[in-house]
Amino acid sequence: MKTNIFFIFLISILNQIYALFNNSYYSNLEQECIKNILNCTQSKTLSLLEPIDQAPIPKSDIISRLLYHTPYISRRDQVLIDEDFLETFYLLYNNPNQLHTLLSLIKDSESGHNWLGFLNNFERCLSDNTLLTCRDNVCKSYSYEKLKFTGNIFVENIIGFEFNIPSNMINFNMSILIYLENEETRTQRIVRIDHHGINVFDALLNCLRYFSRYYNFSFPLIQEMEKYNEVLPFRSEFSNLLIRTY
């Protein structure tokens, strides 16, 4: 079962989505829970990591850990100059956001089947794992180990998610869709990055739950995600029986 969820229609509320994902308010906090937190911390007000109505300030030198990758060996020993190569080249050429774009393309689930796999192989050969970017004849080098990675996936330009439950119902797989653009060459592409784990889905659902409750209205997206949540692996009710496992 595969579900595509796109947040293009949420552009007008994107600031709230950014903020909610980053601080404790995205969780579905009941009044009793908030009261307990205040009693525990002896605080009169909740202290948020970020203002609820403001998005984080994007920084080009901070990269989502979603784009972190381990260089792998590619079997390609040559690069074919074809349409795919040229499209990717134009996407990178003089791109103001070249580093993020390059890492996104390498991490793309399709990169192992094209010339970017060769590029990844070449990177593995460098002893210091150096990345180079060039724009307007000005080149910069980056040490891969010294790049600033953050757990926040929304520092990248995410436009959608794909959720997939396999037939065996023991794994949860999802893909995160990132929109890449180069205004210099007027080229665009959507890359698909595989993500294993249910944490992003939970955070996303809790974010929408809060938004729905805060503004006191429901919408089809959250209804579909709630239905989807019910059939996810390990979401059945806990048993009251003690079962021996040996």
Curated annotation (Swiss-Prot):
Signal sequence coordinates: 1-19
Biological processes per GO annotation: fusion of virus membrane with host plasma membrane; symbiont entry into host cell
Primary location class: virion
Coiled-coil regions listed: none
Keyword Transmembrane helix: no
GO cellular component, one term: virion membrane
Keyword Cell inner membrane: no
Keywords, alphabetical: Disulfide bond, Fusion of virus membrane with host cell membrane, Fusion of virus membrane with host membrane, Glycoprotein, Host cell membrane, Host Golgi apparatus, Host membrane, Membrane, Signal, Viral envelope protein, Viral penetration into host cytoplasm, Virion, Virus entry into host cell
Disulfide pattern: C134-C139
Cellular compartments annotated: Virion membrane; Host cell membrane; Host Golgi apparatus, Host trans-Golgi network
Name of one Pfam family that matches: Cytomega_gL
Residue ranges occupied by any gL betaherpesvirus-type domain in the UniProt entry: 29-235
Lipid bilayer topology: Peripheral membrane protein
Quaternary assembly: Interacts with glycoprotein H (gH); this interaction is necessary for the correct processing and cell surface expression of gH.
HAMAP family on file: HSV_GL_betahv
Function (record text): The heterodimer glycoprotein H-glycoprotein L is required for the fusion of viral and plasma membranes leading to virus entry into the host cell. Acts as a functional inhibitor of gH and maintains gH in an inhibited form. Upon binding to host integrins, gL dissociates from gH leading to activation of the viral fusion glycoproteins gB and gH.
Family per similarity comment: Belongs to the herpesviridae glycoprotein L (gL) family. Betaherpesvirinae gL subfamily.
Protein name: Envelope glycoprotein L
